[in-house]
């Protein structure tokens, strides 16, 4: 009877070992891999680096051009397509929040640029006014100097008349 019990325990231990893989992370299957369009067969025993390369290569060909664009709308469109391929809970709402924040920041930057341009114009007008004021003062000084010189000449003439 004890032999039977030992035999059953041995069978149970062996069956548990057969059910557990030696390396559970050796095979990677994710929903993300299965959703890519370029992969038609299951890829077995891929390494993490290979999995990333397979996902990147499966992206549409125009993505590199769209990601090189400086237009934020292209980035948003790419992210929306990624959310279609790789659904993420709350992903769309988070993207909308980011777009709203971006738009708010951009309008703030545009307002600051407008204020800066107005300030530059006002500064230029002030500098022009100051140069006009300086030249007006110089004109007044020149007139006063010439008037003083004229009066000095007349005084000299009067002195000469008095002396003669």
From Swiss-Prot:
Keyword Nucleotide-binding: no
Gene Ontology cellular component annotations, sorted alphabetically: condensed chromosome, centromeric region; cytosol; DASH complex; kinetochore; mitotic spindle; mitotic spindle pole body; nucleus; spindle microtubule
InterPro entries tied to this protein: Spc34
Record's subcellular location: Nucleus; Cytoplasm, Cytoskeleton, Spindle; Chromosome, Centromere, Kinetochore; Cytoplasm, Cytoskeleton
Keywords annotated in UniProt: Cell cycle, Cell division, Centromere, Chromosome, Chromosome partition, Coiled coil, Cytoplasm, Cytoskeleton, Kinetochore, Microtubule, Mitosis, Nucleus
Pfam families tied to this protein: DASH_Spc34 (PF08657)
GO-annotated biological processes: attachment of spindle microtubules to kinetochore; cell division; mitotic sister chromatid biorientation; protein transport along microtubule to mitotic spindle pole body; spindle attachment to meiosis I kinetochore
Gene disruption: observed consequences: Sensitive to thiabendazole and osmotic stress.
Positions in coiled-coil regions: 104-164
Function: Component of the DASH complex that connects microtubules with kinetochores and couples microtubule depolymerisation to chromosome movement; it is involved in retrieving kinetochores to the spindle poles before their re-orientation on the spindle in early mitosis and allows microtubule depolymerization to pull chromosomes apart and resist detachment during anaphase.
Quaternary organization: Component of the DASH complex consisting of ask1, dad1, dad2, dad3, dad4, dam1, duo1, dad5, spc19 and spc34, with a stoichiometry of one copy of each subunit per complex. Multiple DASH complexes oligomerize to form a ring that encircles spindle microtubules and organizes the rod-like NDC80 complexes of the outer kinetochore. DASH complex oligomerization strengthens microtubule attachments. On cytoplasmic microtubules, DASH complexes appear to form patches instead of rings.
Family the entry assigns: Belongs to the DASH complex SPC34 family.
Protein name: DASH complex subunit spc34
Native source species: Schizosaccharomyces pombe (strain 972 / ATCC 24843) (Fission yeast)
Organism placement in taxonomy: Eukaryota, Fungi, Dikarya, Ascomycota, Taphrinomycotina
């Amino acid at each position: 009877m004890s032999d039977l019990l030992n035999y059953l325990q041995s069978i149970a231990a062996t069956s548990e070992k057969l059910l557990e893989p030696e390396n559970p992370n050796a095979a990677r299957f994710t929903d993300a891999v299965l959703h890519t369009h370029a992969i038609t067969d299951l890829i077995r025993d891929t390494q993490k680096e290979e999995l990333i390369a397979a996902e990147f290569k499966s992206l549409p060909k125009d993505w590199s051009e769209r990601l090189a664009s400086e237009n934020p709308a292209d980035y948003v469109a790419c992210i929306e397509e990624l959310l279609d391929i790789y659904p993420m809970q709350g992903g769309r709402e988070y993207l909308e929040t980011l777009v709203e924040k971006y738009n708010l920041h951009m309008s703030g930057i545009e307002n600051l640029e407008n204020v800066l341009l107005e300030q530059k114009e006002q500064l230029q007008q002030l500098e022009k006014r100051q140069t006009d004021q300086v030249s007006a003062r110089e004109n007044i000084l020149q007139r006063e100097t010439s008037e003083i010189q004229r009066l000095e000449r007349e005084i000299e003439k009067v002195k000469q008349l008095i002396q003669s």
